[in-house]
């Protein structure tokens, strides 16, 4: 399938600089650039399929991009197309971790029970607000005493502590745990860091 590209897209596809940022409006063809760059790296730069990873923010978008790549270039094999969390999950499995992800319904249930002690009406929006606060705090890697939640500090701390205690007891992970653990491994284990530097030669993020 022939794809019509303008000069800007061709330049982005064939550019040889180590790090490249493509800034363009929605619908302008950034995804088209990415799948064409993957093909260019393989066909022209002789990269191996396993040298390339393509990251996007949802599983649906990753699957769509993978299918577009295969259909456009008539490929049966493709590089890794996935989400950040999907990549982190694979890395941790490769390093010997056993991972069971907590179900979203259970997350909501834990928070609902706690909030019900403080509020007569606990709706899904309030539960999501608490879970978003927990996620923001965890990924900030900061001290809980310095974190400013959008709910009361007392309620937030209780929600956070009971949520983490439940996960620890049941040996469960959430998606933030994946990214935090991978970051820790890469920062504190030079063998692992250098191993993935050698493994992932081309990283494309949509």
Where do the model's predicted regions map?
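Conserved pre-motif I regulatory segment
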Residues: 1-23, 159, 176-182
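Short secondary-structure boundary/capping elements
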Residues: 4, 30-33, 184-188
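Walker A/P-loop
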Residues: 17-37
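A basic/glycine-biased coupling hinge at the interface between accessory DNA-binding modules
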Residues: 41-200
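Hydrophobic residues in beta-strands of the RecA-like P-loop NTPase core, especially within AAA+ ATPase
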Residues: 204-205
